């Protein structure tokens, strides 16, 4: 996913040598993006929060990311927290020579996860009744399901979300402590 976002931006000329990459993340995207940026020579700044595991914050830093850590309400992941992380990232993205990967609105993430769908089919090499995946940006579930649905297996796709924040299934927002999923609102442009 991170490599797909960076390489897609490079191919379109939106990201060039010397630029800084910015993103908001609870850890998985941020760690991956920091790693890809380190390999490719880009500076990386991640807006995250103390609601996410210290190990995730440490991993992003270890891969070279500079962090802006937003305080949470007692460690809870809420729509308001995610919106504040996005707001701060959008402000950072206003600076010259900065590229915002914008994971919730970046079509490259789906293409990045299509490779995972192809690998699942190749490795299992047998019918797949169902595929379950948690939803954060939804890129993983969309990319994998796109490939699985093209197969002759008729795979059922199931999105998973915390019981206390069933936004996709009921529209109900709620706080939870499941990192990396359930932002409790839609942020599509």
Language-model segments: residues:
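Active-site/ligand-binding-proximal alpha/beta "capping" segment
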Residues: 95-135
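Short internal beta-strands
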Residues: 46-49, 158-162
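Positively charged, low-complexity intrinsically disordered leader regions
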Residues: 1-17
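Glycine-rich beta-alpha junction loops
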Residues: 105-106, 136-139, 161-166, 172
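Active-site-proximal loop->helix
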Residues: 29-89, 168-182
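A short, small-residue-rich loop immediately preceding and capping a beta-strand
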Residues: 15-49, 128-140
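Conserved small/polar residues in nucleotide/adenosyl-binding loops
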Residues: 186-187
């Amino acid at each position: 996913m991170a490599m797909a976002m960076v390489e897609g931006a490079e191919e379109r000329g939106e990201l060039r040598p010397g630029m800084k990459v910015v993103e908001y993340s609870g850890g998985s995207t941020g760690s991956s993006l920091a790693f890809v940026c380190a390999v490719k020579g880009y500076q990386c700044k991640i807006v995250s929060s103390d609601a996410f595991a210290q190990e995730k914050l440490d991993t992003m830093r270890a891969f070279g990311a500079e962090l802006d850590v937003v305080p949470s309400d007692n460690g809870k992941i809420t729509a308001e927290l995610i919106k504040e992380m996005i707001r701060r990232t959008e402000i950072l993205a206003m600076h010259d020579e900065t590229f915002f990967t914008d994971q919730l609105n970046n079509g490259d993430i789906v293409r990045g996860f299509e490779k995972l769908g192809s690998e699942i089919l190749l490795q299992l090499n047998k019918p797949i009744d169902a595929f379950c995946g948690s939803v954060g940006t939804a890129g993983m579930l969309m990319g994998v399901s796109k490939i699985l649905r093209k197969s002759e297996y008729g795979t059922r796709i199931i999105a998973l979300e915390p019981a206390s924040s069933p936004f996709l299934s009921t529209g109900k927002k709620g706080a939870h402590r499941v990192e990396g999923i359930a932002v409790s609102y839609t942020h599509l442009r």
